[in-house]
Amino acid sequence: MVKGVAVLSSSEGVSGTIYFTQEGDGPTTVTGNVSGLKPGPHGFHVHALGDTTNGCLSTGPHFNPAGKEHGAPDDEVRHAGDLGNVTVGEDGTAAFTIVDKQIPLTGPHSIIGRAVVVHADPDDLGKGGHELSKTTGNTGGRVACGINGLQG
């Protein structure tokens, strides 16, 4: 089993820990807890870079090795890093589990060393009709991020 972990931080008081596990060539399971967010859905993505030298802004676009348009996690056409939304409760926290086949922890398209980003607004899953729907899901600013590092 391969495991990764990302510790989220931000200048806006958002924090959290995201765990990744993958057994063999199976799907990757993502479990996380995030706090300090406004209630409601927030876009949640793996970004292409593990660079936080300029905060979350330097993490690059969504991880997209196949060069596809943005979409929902269950869509055939989507960025590999498109993980949809995490839903935050009235207390400002979210606990979630996501199982996904497009974010391996090994091989040429591994997400180890890449950033995980929580956005300010909901991901419209590429279906919102906004000019940014097919690239970012119109998710607004990047409110927290962390680098997915290999875990022992």
Curated annotation (Swiss-Prot):
Chain positions recorded as Cu cation binding sites: 45, 47, 62, 119
Database matches in SUPFAM superfamilies: Cu,Zn superoxide dismutase-like
Disulphide bond pairs: 56-145
EC number: 1.15.1.1
Pfam families membership: Sod_Cu
Reaction(s) catalysed (UniProt annotation): 2 superoxide + 2 H(+) = H2O2 + O2
Subcellular location, record wording: Cytoplasm
Gene Ontology cellular component annotations, sorted alphabetically: cytoplasm
Main location: cytoplasm
GO MF, one annotated term: superoxide dismutase activity
The record's free-text note on cofactor binding: Binds 1 copper ion per subunit. Binds 1 zinc ion per subunit.
Physiological role: Destroys radicals which are normally produced within the cells and which are toxic to biological systems.
Subunit structure, as described in the record: Homodimer.
PANTHER family associated with the record: SUPEROXIDE DISMUTASE CU-ZN -RELATED (PTHR10003)
Protein name: Superoxide dismutase [Cu-Zn]
